[in-house]
Amino acid sequence: QRTREEENTLCEVWAEVAEYAARSGITIGIEPINRYESYMCTSAEEVLRFIKRVNAPNLSLHLDTFHMNIEETSFYEPVIAAGSRLRHIHMTESDRGMLGEGNVRWDDLFRGLQEIDFNGNLVLENFSNSVPGMAVAVSLWRPSKYNADELAKGSLAFMRKMTCEHQ
């Protein structure tokens, strides 16, 4: 359980970093990370609350569908709650594999993106243990069904299909 002091420190640091970045026209995206990797900012709601508290216009939300699958009860609601504060999304499947073959509710996510008129970055984030060192770096203990090229091509095709269906 985090303390009030930790929350205050987080806000002080974010405010200082945001002010420094703003001088160069940089927007910072804060990514909620699942509870197994962090105890601070594990959901979109928490990050948005801290962003509101810091009140820096160049702080934004950076979602990741892998972490959303663990921490969020919906793929739609966090997108709607973020609105224009959402600027960047890591697109990855629940098992870090091929988009569309896992548990991520892609239609809900893309419906939300359409409703907020999202114009930020959709970034493919696949991991294959065919890449040396990747298995240990991201805890991919089972063999990948696809090599890195197959994952990239198939997932990009899926993203394009979903984007076209939700315009």
What are these regions (language model features)?
Residues 37-38:
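Hinge/beta->alpha junction and helix N-cap segments in small-molecule ligand-binding domains
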Residues 1, 24-34:
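Active-site groove signature of glycoside hydrolases
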Residues 21-28, 163-167:
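Surface-exposed helix-capping loop/turn segments at secondary-structure junctions
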Residues 41-63, 68-167:
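Histidine-acidic metal/acid-base catalytic patches
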